Design a protein with these regions (language model features):
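Short acidic (Asp/Glu) and glycine-rich catalytic loops that position anionic groups and cofactors
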Residues: 14-18, 117-119, 240-248
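Extracellular repeat-rich scaffold modules on cell surfaces
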Residues: 9-12
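Short intrinsically disordered coil segments
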Residues: 75-80, 111-113, 237-242, 281-284
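Intrinsic-disorder/low-complexity coil detector
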Residues: 5, 62, 242, 284-286
Length: 298
């Protein structure tokens, strides 16, 4: 993500420590927010004035639109979280974030889950999840259990069922976990798959449909799919899913780069791995079987 930043382009020649002094000839010290000078400038060449030590430099930069900027910031956040988890666990714990629960997120989950399925621990992060409808597909993968394994003379061991995660799992959720992200969290709770860490989810449990079109090509979205527990209780709607371990990310600490929820998930899994280490797959010598049935012995 960082390499895709407009300032990272080699022809811009911006360096860490440079001070932005002006945009299109207008000094940034004369305005309250520098972004005011970037309005309607996406994908247009902008004259960027930099100060490097005592040297003034002018260069050309082409800003991204706000959507691209948001995507790059998101990818940077996910990458930073993954690096933090890997460093804290020495590579024993994996991390994946689900942005939403749509068709594009199937690809994201498959890529990240099957990269990490052989780790001793895994954090599935559904904070800020925007919903969709793939909760059952994901939960199905998490319910798979290894009951046997193959061990060739040369090569790696392979569990049956294949690509089964055998380690300790934790799910991160918060007050911005929405719709199918909440259904996923509720399923994790109901099926006792993993503990949930974070904050109570949004409470939007009645699904909407976009099939109600009107004559002017508009759409009337109607809440029409409530969900219930097997015993008939309303779940999610109006209340959300409460975490097993409540941890809040406070504003100033979050602004300063601290993620208490992620740190709690790492700490929880590290403790679990001490208390319940994951036993490696290891085959025993073949037992003695005796003589074949068609061999007669005296």
């Amino acid at each position: 993500p960082l390499s895709a930043s407009p300032l990272a382009r080699i022809e811009v020649d911006a360096q860490e420590g440079d001070v932005i002094a002006s945009l299109n000839g207008k000094k940034v010290t004369n305005i309250a927010d520098v972004t005011q000078l970037l309005r309607n400038q996406d994908n247009k060449q902008v004259l960027l004035g930099l100060v490097r030590g005592k040297i003034a430099i002018n260069t050309i930069v082409t800003p991204h639109d706000i959507g691209t900027d948001a995507k790059l910031r998101y990818l940077d956040w996910v990458e930073h979280n993954g690096d933090k988890v890997a460093k804290a666990s020495k590579g024993n714990i994996g991390y994946l974030h689900l942005y939403a629960m749509g068709s594009g997120d199937v690809e994201s989950f498959a890529r990240e889950f099957y990269t990490n399925y052989d780790k001793e621990g895994l954090i599935i992060d559904v904070r800020r999840n925007r919903g969709g409808n793939i909760d059952s597909w994901i939960i199905e993968k998490l319910l798979r259990r290894a009951w046997a394994f193959w061990q060739p003379t040369h090569g790696s061991k392979n569990a049956n069922m294949q690509q089964t995660f055998r380690g300790h799992l934790v799910v991160l959720a918060d007050q911005m976990t929405y719709s199918d992200g909440e259904t996923f969290s509720a399923g994790i709770r109901a099926l006792n798959i993993a503990p949930i860490i974070g904050k109570q989810t949004a409470g939007a449990g009645v699904w909407l449909s976009g099939r109600n079109s009107v004559t002017d090509k508009g759409m009337a979205r109607v809440a029409e799919y409530p969900q219930y527990a097997i015993d008939g209780r309303w779940i999610v709607e109006g209340h959300g899913v409460e975490p097993d371990i409540e941890v809040d990310n406070l504003p100033y600490a979050t602004f300063s780069g601290k993620d208490a929820q992620l740190e709690a998930a790492i700490s929880y899994l590290k403790d679990e791995l001490v208390k319940q280490p994951i036993k490696p797959l290891s085959g025993l010598p073949i037992p003695k079987t005796g003589s074949a049935a068609d061999i007669k012995t005296k």
